[in-house]
Amino acid sequence: MRPVRSTPAHQTADFAELVCSNSLKSDSENTAPWLLKEEMRRAGSLLLEIARECAVPAGHALAVDRVAFAARVTEAITREGRITVRREEITSVDEAGEQVTIVATGPLTSESLAEEIARLSEPQERAEPERASRPLPHNSHSPHLYFYDSISPIVEADSIDMTRVYLAARYDKGSADYINCPMTKGEYSRFYDALLEAQSVEERDWEKLNYFEGCLPIEEIARRGRDTLRFGPMKPVGLMDPRTGKMPYAVVQLRQENLRADSYNLVGFQNHLKFGEQARVLRLIPGLENAQFFRYGQIHRNTYINAPTLLRETLQMKAHPYVLFAGQICGVEGYVESIATGLMAGMHAAAMASGLDPLPSPRASAFGSLVHYVTHADPRNFQPANITFDLLPALDKKVRDRKERHRLQCELALREFDAWMEKAGMPAVRA
């Protein structure tokens, strides 16, 4: 819709304007971001090709000159004779017809279109016309459309010191599924002081949020008083330490993140701290002194749908199969992930336009793992995700060495990806 109607973050009329970081993540071989980009390269991603042409020195990462990148993308699209560019705000989606539509409007989707997406997302018997006419507040969410995300850190299971923690469920109800990190009064005081001193991410004006009381950043809870955490996410009541027979002064609970039990979520630890500060503060928690993090906590403005409820593995809506979602609005996080899902949606849309059924990408690939997460995560607690090895399926054999395990996962992913491309009639681009 730019420049007819702009957003609070964009400055130009160019496509693909990068408003935050200029980094497209690690280019180190056998890392998860590298794997996703390698699959994109083999699928012939135009945006990745342009990013390489606009790259600036950034060590082992792919970073771009953001002005040159946006200009080159805009030029490539406007010069393509088969693409018609319409500079106008879209406020409705034709879900009833058979025209394939991809919704890829990003985290700053306009309010009018957000209302339309909320209407599409409602169960059919509840999607009444007058419902869509009510404005959706941007500090709230509808049942299937959210306006900011709150993400708790995820720690690698192998990096938890199990000699310092214990398994238990609160009041011994159900099975002992939580890892509990107990704190003494002194340990809690050190953690609390470090948390209050930690630096937060600086917000732009358009990113400022009005938090839900039920989903406050942990540092915001801490600012309300020295004991607020002990009566909130670090509440020890009902979590007796079997080693001492006593209730700890405070407890941090870790919840299993996947079926493989190789990663754990820090319950209630969504935060708005800088990543380096998170690592420093969270490693003060007993048992996490040497913690390795798959993901750090985040809270930021973000419009996205409850994809596990709404989307198929082909990124099509379950209720409206001619409508596909891609990019951050479908529940992925980051430039590379957004480009990748856009590429996938485009491939599926092309198949549909040719009268073919879209073929889901293989589960073992980075493409497939990213979409599998988006479409199979717990819809009651769905949060956007970056590509990490945590999303990829485990190997058939256990490999303790992390680097070797990741190398083998990448090898399997690319083999499966190439076979999928061949089956879909799009031979992979070789090096």
Sequence positions of predicted segments:
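Flexible, glycine/charged-enriched surface loops at secondary-structure junctions
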Residues: 203-209, 290-296, 356-361, 428-430
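C-terminal auxiliary extensions adjacent to catalytic cores
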Residues: 385-431
